[in-house]
A protein has these predicted regions:
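Alpha-helical segment of the N-proximal tetratricopeptide repeat
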Residues: 36-69
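Short, conserved micro-motifs composed of acidic
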Residues: 35, 41-42, 86, 90, ...
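C-terminal motif of bacterial Sec signal peptides marking the signal peptidase cleavage site
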Residues: 21-24
């Protein structure tokens, strides 16, 4: 699939909706009895716990309740804005960042940057450019040089967006439908042949009640859907050999020979930080074997390691590409490790600064036929937050990443792009 020649051939791309922002943080079926009787300080503790563990939908529900009693609390307002942002409700995030920026910019200088960013992510590109420029001139923090680089990148992204929107690609984007898209969120689609799709789903749209906070368990699980007569079935859970109880499980992919299945398990560490690790399950004679956690070379202790994709290499060996927040070029980077015929993983190496930026690179997918790596980044100039990019090569030798264009990329986050095996289409999350 070559997006530089996409205007000559029609591609059908199916989209799974990452719908956190559309469900709204203020609703979730929680009754007054469940949330009533708590002081605003206790609600704040609950909200902070959910935020720290990455459950932003639940966090913004409780932050909203705190602000009903403490409407002038800018610290909580900023946390609410962050929760809205991370749950993809960019309109509400924009309004709350603006409130903080207007009332206490000195204490929260980054609220100006996030205000500009959410203008961009709601498609208001001329306004966003203006606010980014203002922020770049006024910001005096210790990381001013870093923020100036980000501002320059975001302004380039706004310019690219205005150009790309006027030159849409010959692409049809199709919503996957309610059989797969749940009310809350889907992630990490992985086609298996022409008629199967493995994906992760958060099958819940309810806010966690106070009495359930201490026993909070992972809710992401891996599902498989089958297509019959052009209609996808309701997703069925993969077996417990993969979906370990009490874990958030996602980001599944097969090795090129379909004998191994790699995926991610996430849980909170002792400090409450969500840490993800990569696991592998052998798939033999149609049955799943008990999964094993990859060794410390891949799962570096104290860091998140996630989003695996596996490519072919020379003489029967393979390459694991994955994402980690271990020290590298910036925030989350894409790394690779060679896998020997005996299944031994070599020390991981960073893909390099041509791919990895000062910001984050996520959700890589390597196409073994075309040798194209697709990934999402918020560090290369883009239309929205995370855009999908493509680059040809392997290991540390890559062409300059290209933005795959509109309408695959939009003003919001577009991630988890994966091509069909016949390269006539693909799937992604938006």
């Amino acid at each position: 699939m070559n997006f530089t020649r996409i205007h000559t051939s029609l591609l059908i791309l199916a989209v799974l909706v990452l719908a956190l922002g559309f469900t709204g943080c203020k609703s979730g079926g929680m009754s007054a009895q469940e949330g009533g009787g708590l002081s605003w300080k206790n609600k704040l503790k609950i909200a902070d716990k959910f935020y720290k563990e990455g459950y932003f939908y639940d966090a913004c529900h409780y932050y909203s309740e705190v602000l009903e009693e403490q409407p002038d609390n800018m610290d909580v307002t900023y946390k609410l804005a962050e929760s809205y942002y991370l749950s993809r409700d960019y309109k509400e995030a924009n309004e709350n960042y603006k409130m903080v920026m207007d009332k206490n910019l000195v204490l929260y200088p980054m609220s100006h940057y996030k205000y500009a960013l959410t203008l961009k992510m709601t498609g208001r590109y001329p306004e966003a450019k203006e606010e980014f420029a203002k922020f770049g001139k006024s910001y005096k923090g210790a990381d001013a040089n870093l923020q100036k680089k980000r501002v320059k990148n975001e302004i380039l992204g706004c310019d690219y967006a205005l150009e790309a929107l006027g030159k849409p690609l010959n692409v049809v984007v199709i919503h996957m439908g309610n059989e797969i898209n749940a009310a809350y969120t889907e992630a990490s689609p992985m086609p298996v042949g022409a008629d199967k799709l493995i994906y992760a789903s958060l099958r819940s749209d309810t806010v966690i009640a106070f009495e359930d906070v201490k026993s909070r368990v992972g809710r992401f699980q891996l599902y498989q859907s089958v297509k019959t007569y052009n209609r996808w079935s309701q997703g069925e859970l993969l077996p417990p050999e993969v979906n370990e109880p009490g874990m958030d499980v996602a980001n599944g992919c097969y090795s090129p020979d379909k004998k191994r299945f790699f995926y991610t398990q996430c849980k909170s560490d002792k400090t409450g930080k969500m840490i993800c690790s990569i696991f592998m399950s052998d798939f033999i004679d149609g049955k799943w074997k008990k999964a094993k956690k990859l060794d410390d070379k891949i799962n570096m202790e104290g860091y998140t390691n996630t989003h695996p994709t596996v490519g072919k290499y020379k003489k029967g060996t393979q390459i694991l590409y994955f994402v980690s927040d271990r020290p590298g070029a910036g925030g989350k980077d894409i790394w690779y490790s060679e896998i020997s015929k005996d299944g031994v993983f070599k020390d991981p190496k960073n893909l390099g600064k041509k791919i990895n930026t000062i910001s984050d690179e996520l959700t890589p997918f390597y196409n073994n036929e075309s040798r194209v790596l697709y990934f999402s980044s918020n560090g290369h100039p883009g239309i929205g937050g995370y855009d999908v990019f493509s680059t040809e090569g392997r290991l540390r030798k890559w062409t300059k990443p290209e933005n795959v264009g509109y309408p695959l990329n939009s003003s919001v986050d577009d991630m988890y792009f994966v091509a069909d095996e016949d390269e006539t289409g693909g799937y992604f999350i938006s």
